[in-house]
Amino acid sequence: MREGEPEVWAETPAVDLQGSGRKPGSRQFRGSSPTSLSAMIGPGEPGLFERMLGRENMLKALRAVETNRGAGGIDGMEVGQLRGYLKEHWAGIKERLLTGGYEPRPVRRVDIPKPGGGTRMLGIPTVLDRLIQQAIHQILSPIWEGEFSEHSYGFRPGRSAAQAVKAAQGHVNAGKRWVVDLDLEKFFDRVNHDVLMARVARRVNDRRMLALIRGYLKSGILAGGVVEARNEGTPQGGPLSPLLSNILLDDLDRELERRGHRFCRYADDCVPRARDEPMSSSGAQLHNR
């Protein structure tokens, strides 16, 4: 057992889940099997999808979910119940993921007040879907991270809002005192799924990965006891949404760079700056696009 790892990861004799009489997807959150979750996850294989499901990546994802905690999704499972559930059901979950039979659950809608008025919608995934999204994020993020614009600060490793503010102040000190406020109103709610998936497919050719990501985009939202179909948007609340937003908005970053503008973007907040007022016409052109 890895030093500092909770006892649940200790190597113990494996059992035959197929002969246990329990369905892998059954609603039972407390696992009683002595099977080592570490052993069940397995060593993984070299393909992109197999790397996502590999032992080390899944363990890292689980630790991230447990560290971030957060509320449960529509099934009522809490983060503290996840390890026991995985020990009982991971073999079946992994099989369904590998064969394309896994279906993400709808997210639970939560509306939170915004400082300036109005509300922001969050979509809270189940903790199991949060785990899988985190595992996807960890595999896909390095593919794009080296390509993202230096002017993008939101939801990126080693970058922060404080750094974005410092960079913006640097633009002011350099004499770029005209500011254009790019309005990306309700960006997360209006993302076109086909456009987004086309951007992802530029760098990912694993059809299973693409299908799983699209499954999360279309998983639906539970609000008022009714599941609403989702044909657009990628609601905030899961680990995958921030990365997908940066992938889509990278085109905006590249267009601003092509025009020679200095700017700072943090998620859907973007503030280009210029020395002269005429840059406002560029802002209007970008808005119309």
Where would I find each of the regions flagged by the language model?
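Conserved phosphate-binding loops in nucleotide/dinucleotide-binding enzymes
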Residues: 121-124
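Conserved polymerase palm-domain catalytic core
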Residues: 89-92, 96-111, 115, 139, ...
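Conserved residues at beta->alpha junctions
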Residues: 52, 126, 274
